[in-house]
Amino acid sequence: MVGMIRGGMGDQNWSRLVFWLILFSGLLVITLEENPEKDEIFLSQFMAPSTGQVNEHMEETSWAQRCWQDSDCVKEAVAEFNLCFPGSKDSRELFGLNHTNLKQTLLDCIQEKGKLNGHNPKYLELLSSMLDIPRRNLATKPGSSPSPSPSRPPKRSRGPPRPPTRPKSPPPRKSSFPPSRSPPPPPAKKNASKNSTSAPVSPAKKKEDHEKTIIIAVVVTAVSTFLLAALFFLCCSRVCGNGSGGRKNDERPLLSLSSSDYSVGSSINYGGSVKGDKQGHQSFNIYSNQGKMSSFDGSNSDTSDSLEERLSHEGLRNNSITNHGLPPLKPPPGRTASVLSGKSFSGKVEPLPPEPPKFLKVSSKKASAPPPPVPAPQMPSSAGPPRPPPPAPPPGSGGPKPPPPPGPKGPRPPPPMSLGPKAPRPPSGPADALDDDAPKTKLKPFFWDKVQANPEHSMVWNDIRSGSFQFNEEMIESLFGYAAADKNKNDKKGSSGQAALPQFVQILEPKKGQNLSILLRALNATTEEVCDALREGNELPVEFIQTLLKMAPTPEEELKLRLYCGEIAQLGSAERFLKAVVDIPFAFKRLEALLFMCTLHEEMAFVKESFQKLEVACKELRGSRLFLKLLEAVLKTGNRMNDGTFRGGAQAFKLDTLLKLADVKGTDGKTTLLHFVVQEIIRTEGVRAARTIRESQSFSSVKTEDLLVEETSEESEENYRNLGLEKVSGLSSELEHVKKSANIDADGLTGTVLKMGHALSKARDFVNSEMKSSGEESGFREALEDFIQNAEGSIMSILEEEKRIMALVKSTGDYFHGKAGKDEGLRLFVIVRDFLIILDKSCKEVREARGRPVRMARKQGSTASASSETPRQTPSLDPRQKLFPAITERRVDQSSSDSD
């Protein structure tokens, strides 16, 4: 049940609480009624209701014989029947009406005579339980209160006695009889007939005692039920007041703050809280004639003490219980029950002091320390110390919200505006806390990248923080501060300038119109020049025509420009220009034809030059003897290295292999396979170059012995290598057109040729269709027709040349790679270009390596001793042997094998 109440204290939860209380009371009443029903059955077995005679079987029992044979008890019971109901003759009616008196008389008799001592206590407990009169029987009586004098009850209809049935409606909720207001009457003494010889008691008095006993039982039951319900409700209220889970928040403020709320005499009416309590209870006036009981009303003075006790136990909630059924809030801090204990509850309380304004609160600079408490403003009050601010408003209350409580740390509020002139600030120094909190002039931002400080490691910034550098605050404000006055002036000037600008009619998109206006101003092109070019076929800048075609208006914009009948001056510069252009028939088709006329000559020159480069490159690559020598050297070297593997015995290879020669290194880690190939080629190419030089001269003065001597001399060997190295290094210049052809975009070249053919076809169709149908005889038409006639032959020749050159390139690719693909020929030029770059680098390294031993030998010869007169018998080593020892060993092995 606590979980159900904590889910919400609305109207639905109040109804649930009342339902559980009614169910609890009904269960208690049903429990109390079960025993009387059993007593009816037992008594009917003991004595017949119709005749009033004792049952023979029950009479035979020992305890029944002892009690029933006592004539005093029987006579006393019969006497009470006759005195109470002298006019009744029917024993069944006597049994039905005086069932309670009979049981009481028998029980008193048995207890007084002591005839049940030592017997089974089961029957004594049964008879004792017969005395419990349930509250339901009292509520079903016709009268609201008994009469002080005995009166004759109304006669009942004859019929068999019925056990008391349960009422259809539950008993009233929360009925309470405080013991302090109506103390119960003293219980009837059970030993009133202790002595059989004493004077008989009057029947009316004895009946009144029994009725008082019934009333006491009912009052005790009701009070117990009410106390349990109140205790349960108090526990639930405290539990629900501490937590806010599931409760609907009331967004309305607690108070409507105004100037009158700050007065001491103002008050808040709390009468509604008692009224709300009053609605939750029912009034019970059982004894309305005597005025013993009263309803729970907030205006009744008899219940003021109990109400104050309840308020003190519940903590004096500041907010009244609303109609939604919300529980009262906790008492504010500082409010205790003792303060209100001595005051009478008049329905109103004094107002609480308002919360101090936010600008009086001082926020701490340190994030770890809480803000210091700010004393509330002193208010004249004679009732004691000022009360703290009220708690948060309940949900649903209207009115403006009170100022929120201060957080742990928030932004500093702006200071109040000062009316006087601002005093000059001194240079910055060791400022105190007040100077730090003072507002500072906003300066221009300095954009940098902040670095997060790491507390675990010491940084240079830790020492800088404690430095002694100070800057002049006035100077930095004057240099880098925002000039508010100048800015306002500039804003005024800008606003006045904008207001002075005329408002133009915009038809184009703002961005398109702005770009077109900038283009017209940049190229200094007027509308008249453009219109004359479109009518007469004059030449215009290519960039201008291309930009106009890119920024051509959409069909909707073009239609608006043509249908515009207003003043031209109201249009913008871009709209005015396009308005004049679109008035010319087929203006943008004329621009396309004009662009073709202006760009055809340049494009044809580029295409012809590219075709020439490709043709020369193919011829150079096919006819280069040195390039073929390199391919031969690489093929033989590769077959030797791949001997015995599936890669060996190759007859050709793709030219991509040339790019891998520099990646294969020797055992020394420096000599590459490309170095080896170059070393082998430069000697043979040097001898060939020397022979070519000699053949160019006259052989009449040259003898064969001289040639042999020169070939075997050391100087001639060095000369051959130099000549061969220069020859190999000149391969890059020999294949110059190949390197240039590698930069040609084959797709771009083919696209340019196709675009020229398409533009020619489009221009021919425009002249033969649109312009011929319009019947226009202008200079533009004549110029375009003449241009088309001259361009047709050139474009057709370019198309034929493109087919021939592309076939030549493809055949060159097939010449080196076998069956090449579509673009394999142009890719071949790229491979050769990259190989020539690597070859030039290798030749440079070989030249540097050959010059290093010569310099070392000369240095050793200059430092040798002058006493060595005998010639050196050791033959001079070949510089290639000094550079590449692996080559020397290989040659020694070959010579030894030849001698064998």
Curated annotation (Swiss-Prot):
Pfam families in alphabetical order: FH2
Compositionally biased spans, kind Pro residues: 160-173, 369-429
Keywords: Membrane, Signal-anchor, Transmembrane, Transmembrane helix
Tissue: Expressed in the endosperm. Localizes to the cell plate, a plant-specific membranous component that is assembled at the plane of cell division.
Membrane topology label: Multi-pass membrane protein
Sequence ranges of Low complexity compositional bias: 359-368
Location of this chain's protein in the cell: Membrane
Signal peptide start-end: none
Biased composition (Polar residues): 281-304, 860-876
Chain intervals for the UniProt region annotation (Disordered): 136-209, 273-440, 849-900
UniProt GO cellular component terms: cytoplasm; membrane; phragmoplast
TM helices/strands, residue ranges: 15-32, 214-234
Main location: membrane
Domain of life: Eukaryota
Residue stretches making up the FH2 domain: 433-865
PANTHER family membership: FORMIN-LIKE PROTEIN 5, FORMIN-RELATED
UniProt similarity note: Belongs to the formin-like family. Class-I subfamily.
Protein name (database record): Formin-like protein 5
Organism this protein belongs to: Arabidopsis thaliana (Mouse-ear cress)
Taxon lineage: Eukaryota, Viridiplantae, Streptophyta, Embryophyta, Tracheophyta
Gene: FH5
